């Protein structure tokens, strides 16, 4: 356990204490020997990387590289984390021993440290079962959304998913869901973090995962949950007869992750011919050998093999899941022969329009609209707001991340409301509220049905997107980031924005663009509110300022919770009838250039631009 601040221990003494404790506790021969080797070599630099600071447990759980030490994902840190989580749950739920928890995992592995998602999941299960708590442990890999689905379906106290989603291959993660089926939000992260610090010494049975196989407390939910998930999914199939007859062909890639068999099953549930799978990428492979980054959000580079297969099989649509299948990218072949990869905001517009249109056909009574909702995050396109204003349902924005949308959706559902859809620009979609998180499996098959239906009207996805913008107003978006590894520099950049025109004066313009409103969710300031106080929750630990411009533009600058990035998201919203998207794009590009030049000031702060 790290020496507490003010304990009088210097940096070297603290490092010595951490490594000594590690040698005493670690029973994984690979990580134990790695630390012994570093000590023998006197490799202080590497030891500091491994032991400098314990991984911080946040609302997204843990995410870090696999390897030895307290700053990495490994057997010992998984045991310590789970012991803390277990003790925290015992305090929160008096019926934990009756209800239990669910654990699943993706296909990640790190042979040099002996770490893998499956191994970590079994160690986590061992921790809970040793305390008399039932564990529903999937016997094989699943998509991340199967964990929140299982929590809700079986009415469990919590869920754990071992995954690093679309991160580089060396990483892994530990994602946590609460009994409401949504990701945890504060203050649970702080409570769990404190409980981890109080339970660092491994419990007697912590390392012996063979004990769980004969335990009556171990349950395998795979078959029943698989069946229940696809039965629930069928309720979102609106055009079964169209699906049976469609001539539209699809290609699917799971990018070496878990999605392949689940998307095949989803297509069968909708009576669609299953998509052609990219053979080099369909099976799980923790090395992700065919891609630089296993992230379909990176666009065409990840989709090269998909496009080649689609060209060969004459498929018009490519569907791409990230490795844990909670996100989805869609690309469509244009008449020119070029491939168009839809942005997260564009697919959000298409899916939102589709789910509302399909719901409206089944609900002719307009009075139901007053209890109908869609959600998106504050940095995502406001296209759903435009559709809601015209059609009469409710739109709400939340803070960034599905933890906020999932928790808000659950509140609304508990109040008897209907939540049709939620999305975020980072290609995350909740099309079916039986999963209170983003779900790339349901999004893939619903996108396929949408494309099949449009084909009966001789429309492509691109043509329908244009029709949505013509009817509800063009929403042109642009997002990017700068890399900055120095937290003090990031803080200074944002503080300077808060005192741009003298102390405590935010900027009144950005270049030639006049600013009409400012919301600062770090300080809680919002000059659009009568009392100047922001309505959305605020957080002093992360930077986030939104500027609204007189020309209808909105831009948000924020820090990333998981990467050394300052991100920006800009959007220009035009009223219906403005059908000159090229002019809007030009104006948005000018606005973004002004923001980069005047607000980011990359030369002054030594920021690295996003690599092309």
UniProtKB/Swiss-Prot annotation:
Q: Where does the chain cross the membrane?
A: none
Which GO terms fall under molecular function for this chain's record? magnesium ion binding; phosphoglucomutase activity; phosphopentomutase activity
GO biological process terms, alphabetically, are:
glucose metabolic process; purine ribonucleoside salvage
Residue positions where N-acetylalanine is found in the record: 2
Q: Where does Mg(2+) bind?
A: 165, 322, 324, 326
Q: Name one Pfam family in it.
A: PGM_PMM_I
Which SUPFAM superfamilies does UniProt cross-reference here? Phosphoglucomutase, C-terminal domain, Phosphoglucomutase, first 3 domains
- Family membership: Belongs to the phosphohexose mutase family.
Q: Tell me, what does this protein do in biology?
A: Catalyzes the conversion of the nucleoside breakdown products ribose-1-phosphate and deoxyribose-1-phosphate to the corresponding 5-phosphopentoses. Catalyzes the reversible isomerization of alpha-D-glucose 1-phosphate to alpha-D-glucose 6-phosphate but with a lower catalytic efficiency. The mechanism proceeds via the intermediate compound alpha-D-glucose 1,6-bisphosphate. In vitro, also has a low glucose 1,6-bisphosphate synthase activity which is most probably not physiologically relevant.
Query: Can you name this protein?
Result: Phosphopentomutase
Please give the organism. Pongo abelii (Sumatran orangutan)
Q: Which gene encodes it?
A: PGM2
């Amino acid at each position: 356990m790290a020496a507490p601040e003010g304990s009088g221990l210097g940096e070297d003494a603290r490092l010595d204490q951490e490594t000594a404790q590690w040698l005493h506790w670690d029973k994984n021969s690979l990580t134990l020997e790695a630390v012994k080797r570093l000590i023998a070599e006197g490799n202080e630099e590497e030891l500091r990387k491994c032991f400098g600071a314990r991984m911080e447990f946040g609302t997204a759980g843990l995410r870090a590289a696999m390897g030895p030490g307290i700053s990495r994902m490994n057997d010992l840190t998984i045991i310590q984390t789970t012991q803390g989580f277990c003790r925290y749950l015992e305090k929160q739920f008096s019926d934990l021993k009756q209800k239990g928890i669910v654990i699943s995992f993706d296909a990640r592995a790190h042979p040099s440290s002996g770490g893998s998602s499956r191994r970590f999941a079994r160690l986590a299960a061992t921790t809970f079962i040793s305390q008399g708590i039932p564990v529903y442990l999937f016997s094989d890999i699943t998509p991340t959304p199967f964990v929140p689905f299982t929590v809700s379906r079986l009415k469990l106290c919590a869920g754990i998913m071992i995954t690093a989603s679309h991160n580089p291959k060396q990483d892994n993660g530990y994602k946590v869901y609460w009994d409401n089926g949504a990701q945890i939000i504060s203050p649970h992260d702080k409570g769990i973090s404190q409980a981890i610090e109080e339970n660092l010494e491994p419990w007697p049975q912590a390392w012996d995962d063979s004990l769980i196989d004969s335990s009556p407390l171990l349950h395998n939910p795979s078959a029943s949950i698989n069946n229940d998930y696809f039965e629930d999914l069928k309720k979102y199939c609106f055009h079964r007869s169209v699906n049976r007859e469609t001539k539209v062909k699809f290609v699917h890639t799971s990018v070496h992750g878990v999605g392949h068999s689940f998307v095949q099953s989803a297509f069968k549930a909708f009576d669609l011919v299953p998509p052609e799978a990219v053979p080099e990428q369909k099976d799980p492979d923790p090395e992700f050998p065919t891609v630089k980054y296993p992230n379909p959000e990176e666009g065409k580079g990840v989709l090269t093999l998909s496009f080649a297969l689609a060209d060969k099989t004459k498929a018009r649509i490519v569907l791409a899941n990230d490795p844990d299948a909670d996100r989805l990218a869609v690309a469509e072949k244009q008449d020119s022969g070029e491939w168009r990869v839809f942005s997260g905001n564009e697919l959000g517009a298409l899916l939102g329009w589709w789910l509302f249109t399909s719901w409206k056909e089944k609900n002719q009574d307009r009075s139901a609209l007053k209890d109908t909702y869609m959600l998106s995050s504050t940095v995502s396109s406001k296209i759903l707001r435009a559709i809601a204003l015209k059609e009469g349902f409710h739109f709400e924005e939340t803070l960034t991340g599905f933890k906020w949308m999932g928790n808000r959706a659950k509140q609304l559902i508990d109040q008897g409301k209907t939540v049709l859809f939620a999305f975020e620009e980072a290609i995350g979609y909740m099309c079916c509220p039986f999963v209170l998180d983003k779900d790339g499996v349901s999004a893939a098959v619903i996108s396929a049905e949408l494309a099949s239906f449009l084909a009966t009207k001789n429309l492509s996805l691109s043509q329908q997107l244009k029709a949505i913008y013509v009817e509800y107003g063009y929403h042109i978006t642009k997002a990017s980031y700068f890399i900055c590894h120095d937290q003090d520099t990031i803080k200074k950049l944002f503080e300077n924005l808060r005192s741009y025109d003298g102390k405590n004066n935010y900027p009144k313009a950005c270049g030639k663009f006049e600013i009409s409103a400012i919301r600062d969710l770090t300080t809680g300031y919002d000059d659009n509110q009568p009392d100047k106080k922001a309505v959305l929750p605020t957080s002093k630990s992360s930077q986030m300022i939104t500027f609204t411009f007189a020309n209808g533009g909105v831009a948000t600058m924020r820090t990333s919770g998981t990467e050394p990035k300052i991100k920006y998201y800009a959007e220009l919203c035009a009223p219906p009838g403005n059908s000159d998207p090229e002019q809007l794009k030009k104006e948005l590009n000018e606005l973004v250039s002004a923001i980069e030049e005047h607000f980011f000031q990359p030369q002054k702060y030594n920021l690295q631009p996003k690599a092309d």
